[in-house]
């Protein structure tokens, strides 16, 4: 298999389906006449009929990650898949081990403690250390040894189902073996000597990136645009060098030149910080005092550097980023299409080039057994087949079949079950009919919103009186207790009018039901037994629940279509942004480890040099690099650009070396100028793309045509992964077309 060849069977989907289908007995029917029933997907792949094999492959194709294609074509396929699914059943252990590796960075004792003084880290107040406990050297070695053993098992387990030849062709596997060897050597060196530097903290983060597929794809995408980024950085450097030289020459004989721009190196540094606007306008105050016209120089510099050059860098980088990202998506789509083509060929035994209605329904019936989606009715099978059959000829071609993963992700809206009260005659009386109509009306909704507003006012007043220790607080507590009865009545009326099944189908109603009963029971017990139950007599926890109830006011915003789109976009964006936020976290971990090894232990009470720094005068001593938790918080402050030059200049003074500037400047260039700007640009484009998708679905639902009616029946509730996939394809449609045509 060539290096570019991608794995075919998805690990994540296999794990998910295994968990959902392996614990229940499969129902009869479907999958062809007289088909055997298999409890696990591995059994179906090895021994099942063509529908069961195809269903397993379709389910595995959803996430696009898995074992190499060679294994699918191997004569020992059944045995290989048995080992593969054993490996997947241990996924919880592999995930827990990766988490343990990252956690070790926070718990191991900093190296400077072992180097400078044996008990230095016990003096937490002196060194401004965090509150997490530290492992001793013996404890760290035991912990690292256990994680190393599990890591070896995880990396070498694929040999059981891939074989040595296929395993060793993968660059990823080779890199893992190399890193594993370096990690083992680092642990051995650490066990027998005390070195001021270790590679283990960095390797742990690399393993995190290589283990999580989304992080790995994100890292590959970012690596692909390094060349473009270096080109625009060179342009920015030329601009900075020229502007610094111009500033140094212009203000040479002025107080600005004598106090701030004393040399070209200092001028270059100050102009770089001004490029980030962190020292604006402090850096040019001396020049401004001499002549107000000098401000034009700095204003033009900031406008060109911040609002033109920085945005130009962002535009070039984001364009390259989309191109690299599109290549990744094209590869994922090709993997999925390849697997679905194999599933199609398994069913199309007569090589007709299409699947008929009965074949598709048999496949969907088998998918019911393997997928984690709710069991689908026969009527829904017809709708899915209609979605696939875009040509309307009652035949699903291989091209139409390629959209199966997106189509089966649709969750069809079910008819609510009838109320249990339907069998009683009084439920159909005119009085009950008017009551049910009233509960379903807008008027009833407005009344509840009005009560919620009163509840909000009551909570604010009661909380204020509690802070002031006023005796009037009890009156407002009684008001809140009375309002609680209104919510119970609201819940009862809705269940009576809609039926519990229809009531429980709405997520908002589930939230209201749990919250209402929790608050009502808590308030009742508090009023009934105010002194016998100490926990309940403390009304603080009920107050927080009352504030949670007020969150129901968000339903007012959801009545507005634009706000509803905002909420939907927010949740979709959070899912799509997680890999990039994860990469930012990994960068922070890398720089935190480096910061501990470079700057660890130099910030401590009694250091005479420390008292001369801005770190001391601004009371930023707790934000240091003396231990891992403190370092992560410090880097977060640098990430948000909050007086970041204070740390840069203070550590310059503390170390006495200008080389320390490289640490902070490189962090700015990688984390802020590159990653955060990419995230901002990604959020902007993703927001507009999601708005277009939401508006398009709104038009489809409101369409009076038969297609609109059909869309109305199929409530498109997709998994987060599917929603993100659709959003990314919509965002990068132009780039994807270009990649596929090239």
From Swiss-Prot:
Q: What is known of its domains?
A: Each of the two internal repeats contains five hydrophobic transmembrane segments (S1, S2, S3, S5, S6) and one positively charged transmembrane segment (S4). S4 segments probably represent the voltage-sensor and are characterized by a series of positively charged amino acids.
Record's keyword terms, sorted: Calcium, Calcium channel, Calcium transport, Glycoprotein, Ion channel, Ion transport, Membrane, Plant defense, Repeat, Transmembrane, Transmembrane helix, Transport, Voltage-gated channel
User: Where does this polypeptide localize?
Assistant: Membrane
Ranges per topology, Extracellular: 104-140, 198-204, 248-258, 274-296, 468-480, 532-540, 604-627, 643-663
Q: Which residues cross the membrane?
A: 83-103, 141-161, 177-197, 205-226, 227-247, 297-317, 447-467, 481-501, 511-531, 541-558, 583-603, 664-684
Q: Does the keyword Calcium apply?
A: yes
Q: Name one GO cellular component term.
A: monoatomic ion channel complex
Indicate what this protein is called per its UniProt record.
Two pore calcium channel protein 1
Topological domain (Cytoplasmic) residues are 1-82, 162-176, 318-446, 502-510, 559-582, 685-742
EF-hand domain: from which residue to which, for each copy?
335-370, 376-411
For membrane topology, the record states: Multi-pass membrane protein
Superkingdom of this protein's organism: Eukaryota
Which InterPro entries does the UniProt record give? EF-hand-dom_pair, EF_hand_dom, Ion_trans_dom, TPC1_plant, Volt_channel_dom_sf
Taxonomic source organism: Hordeum vulgare
* Known role: Functions as a voltage-gated inward-rectifying Ca(2+) channel (VDCC) across the plasma membrane that mediates sucrose-induced Ca(2+) influx in autotrophically grown leaf cells. Acts as the major ROS-responsive Ca(2+) channel and is the possible target of Al-dependent inhibition. Plays a regulatory role in defense responses.
Q: Identify the stretch(es) annotated as Disordered.
A: 1-44
